[in-house]
Amino acid sequence: MRLGFAGAGGDALSYAVDLGLPPPKPPSAFNRDPEVKTEVIWSGPVPRPAARLVERAGAALRVRDGRGWATVGRVLPPWTSMLTEYADPQAAPEMLTLRDAVRAWRFYDHFRCDVQAPARAPQLGSRTPVLSGDGHDFAAALQTINEIGDAEALYAAVADAFDGAQVAVQISDDGRFEVTMQQPGMLRPLRTAELSDGTLRFLMWAVALLTPRPPPLMVLNEPETSLHPDLLPALGALIARASRETQLIVVSHAMRLVAAIEDAAPADACQRIELEKSLGETVAQCHGACDAPQWHWPER
């Protein structure tokens, strides 16, 4: 299996890793675990010999040293990446730069909204510019947007989605934060524990997308789950807005959401890639939209 990505820009860092099965000897219960065969960091889109900055072959690692190479006197375990095993800001600053960039990526797969979900309970709060994957810091993240983020955009998105509703953060005497929602016609605000699954999930998506610290890449998996169809246009507008500051990959089965994103985003800012099954294999049906940057896999 091979994984890789190219950085944006002509001199940006690119990375590739090639994984395979280990040799059968010595015998081990883990002989089915993949191991790293090669890893390469290079500058630009193509891993030409002159563009390579760091190379790994099996357990051996070498880094660029002027016009030549310097071998790192350290044996790398075959089951771990060189990005986690070696860090030297002098000899290989590219590894630290790349590692920090990858760590900044955010993946949101599923926000829990069940009765026992962490987001439904009051939680101790501290400044939270990035919403966690399980949503336990939901109230603190919303309050952080109130203080240092685009609170106006948050309030506008909620009002648009829920017919003029307003959200607020209540803070108890012991420092616990809880989100409340005031809807027109209701005599009192609803606590987080009283919100429907779809309402809570939309609010969490809004907080994640309006983060005061946008990442270089954010991936959303089926954000339409549990949402009422009438909420999808508002969610699409939020996603389109967030795409101004970060690269977004959205995996969705809801064509209404896809259409809402395309309607809200600039014409050249959105690329649709449709997937279909062909003899049990998932393939991309791009119809000319998948013209990717030039890419070459490094050889083993």
Predicted regions and their residues:
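C-terminal lobe/lid and adjacent interdomain/linker elements of RecA-like ASCE P-loop ATPase modules
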Residues: P233-R300
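Electropositive, glycine-dotted interaction segments
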Residues: A6-A156
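Conserved ABC ATPase signature
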Residues: Q143, E152, A156-A159, D163-L210, ...
